[in-house]
């Protein structure tokens, strides 16, 4: 199909230009597989680090489900889930966490503050904001960690379990 040829050309071009050392693509619905191809030094069993793509695959999808069910609203604020949040972070909304506009920076290492993953919320909320919420986007994993903890509270289960 022509659409899959476009995907093939794009992935091949990226490989040739050095954008990545290898790639794999598959398109299917249910048990039906319409397109499957690998590029570079990999095969269909090669594991790839999805890194930040997981934001789309996990918390964003769960948040969308909770939004659809009415269990979460884009206007819900950090204070709704963490009543002890510091004043400067209380009004950060779910939408701001999802769009990287909550003012939360991403320039510190958790290991400098704690070795316990359970302290994540306390560490994030205790760290100074880089700017006021609602400003320009600042790409940050920390906002998504906070969002993940909110979703865990709503869903009653860990996202990584």
Provide a role label for each language-model segment.
Residues 43-45, 127-133, 144-145:
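Flexible glycine/proline-enriched surface loops and loop-helix/loop-strand junctions
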